[in-house]
Regions:
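Extended alpha-helical targeting/anchoring segments
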Residues: 1-448
Length: 448
């Protein structure tokens, strides 16, 4: 088996300095664990100059596109990291699946307007990466054996130079964020969801609204401000064409595969952070004790057990954590963990095909909930509730749910906030929660 070469670099907890060296390059991508402010994530991965870019073509099925991804990894070729290396990436795919990639996997109506025209998936095939391991306090370049030696030497020279001490990038909104739907429209949508629940169509539907603003400047400057204001373990920045970008500050894992072991960490249940320690603790205790939030979370856990069971070895799906508390700068969340094991005949792409999009951001049952979302949300979700991910040539994968995420495109920046609607949901509280989840993002950018 060919072995990747690893070149040590000076360790930096903050990945933005290293990323600044490549951020203008084609296909520049950063998967960011939010250090040094966040403390849950272990690795940062960044790369650029992909060997190829893969995106769906007209009338291609989701299964066919996933097979093209599988074929691209095979073209790059099998490789292993040096013995005992814990690094997560040995060369392979990095990119995103938009929520609307789900349309390529399941039959859905086409009622919501596709006004952002973002491709439903875009992944680069990368022969190298700069990986920081915050547990070992190390940074290193990882080179797939197929990468040409002169390219390795060029990258070593690039990353061994002094990092820039300042970035002159700036970002400015021309007006505050505005929502696409007003409170009355939101109330009517929740009434419609309640009618579907009472009719037996569904138990829970994730309903979201979009916020938009015009901007000038560089989205990278916006991301740098956001990662300080809202550090999260599944953040990321993806450069797109024409200085457009994806900016993600997600707290939520979708699915991880490591040595054929599968983990998903659904979030369902939210409270704001308090202004005082006592108020903050009260919100956390209220969330942990909330029968409504626990019921919502359990519905999604059951859905994800089913989704993982479509691909994982029979009898391997477990729930090692139910209703755990995770706290972030803006919110407390209720988080559960579902695990499983891939059988020899299945891989991470089979798992994606059987479980995308995530159950925590659709509802239960999933397909009917997605049909209702398409009926009631006026525009397609685009990036929102899709996934940022890597998948390497060994089959190792990690992926996020693209919540708390923004799309900067054609001088307009969009973000979304949503929540799970169940039979006893009060529309006013749910409406306010959509603002709570993204307020820190919007206020941070409005202050620039």
């Amino acid at each position: 088996m060919p072995i990747c070469s690893v070149h040590p670099l000076a360790y930096h907890a903050d990945p933005t300095g290293y990323f600044s060296l490549v951020r203008h390059a084609p296909g520049a991508v950063l998967l960011d664990s939010g250090r040094p402010e966040a403390d849950r994530g272990r690795f940062d991965i960044l790369s650029a100059w992909p060997l190829e870019i893969l995106a769906p073509v007209a009338d291609e099925t989701g299964t066919a596109f996933l097979q093209r991804l599988r074929d691209s990894l095979a073209r790059l070729g099998d490789a292993q990291l040096p013995e005992h290396s814990p690094l997560p990436f040995a060369g392979g795919l990095i990119g995103y699946l938009a929520y609307d990639f789900g349309r390529m996997l399941e039959p859905l109506p086409a009622q919501a307007v596709d006004d952002l025209h973002l491709p439903s998936a875009r992944l680069g095939l990368y022969g190298w990466a700069m990986v920081s391991d915050h547990q070992a306090r190390s940074s290193q370049l990882v080179f797939h054996p197929a990468l040409a030696d002169d390219e390795r030497q060029r990258l070593i020279g690039l990353f061994e130079q002094s990092l820039p001490t300042a970035d002159d990038a700036s970002f400015h909104l021309s007006a505050p964020f505005a929502t696409d739907i007003d409170a009355e429209h939101y109330r009517q949508a929740i009434e419609r969801i309640h009618a579907y629940i009472q009719a037996g169509d569904c138990y829970q539907v994730n309903f979201a609204q979009r916020f938009r603003a015009q901007y000038s400047g560089d989205p990278w400057a916006a991301y740098q401000a956001l990662r300080v204001a809202c550090p999260t373990p599944f953040a990321g920045y993806l450069s797109l064409a024409d200085n457009d970008a994806i900016l993600s500050l997600s707290p939520e894992r979708f699915v991880k595969v490591s040595q054929r072991q599968v983990e998903t960490r659904p979030i369902k249940g939210t409270r704001p952070r308090g202004n005082t320690p006592a108020e903050d603790a009260a919100y956390a205790e209220e969330l942990l004790a909330s029968e409504k939030d626990r019921a919502e979370n359990l519905m999604i856990v059951d859905l994800l057990r089913n989704d993982l069971g479509r691909t994982c070895r029979t009898g391997s799906v477990r729930v090692p954590q139910l209703f755990g508390l995770e706290s972030y700068p803006n919110v407390h969340h209720l988080v559960s963990v579902v695990t499983g094991e891939l059988p020899a005949a299945k891989d991470a792409l089979d798992l994606l095909g059987g479980s995308f999009p995530g159950g925590s951001i659709t509802g239960a049952p999933k397909i009917r909930s997605m049909q209702i979302i398409d009926e009631l949300e006026p525009s397609r979700r685009s990036l929102y509730c899709g996934s940022l991910l890597y998948l390497d040539v060994r089959g190792e994968m990690d992926s996020s749910i693209a919540i708390r995420s923004l799309l900067a495109q054609d001088g307009q920046i969009s973000c979304w906030g949503g929540g799970g609607i169940v039979a006893d949901s009060q529309w006013e509280a749910e409406y306010q929660e959509t603002f709570t989840k993204v307020r820190v993002l919007m206020q941070t950018l409005e202050a620039l």
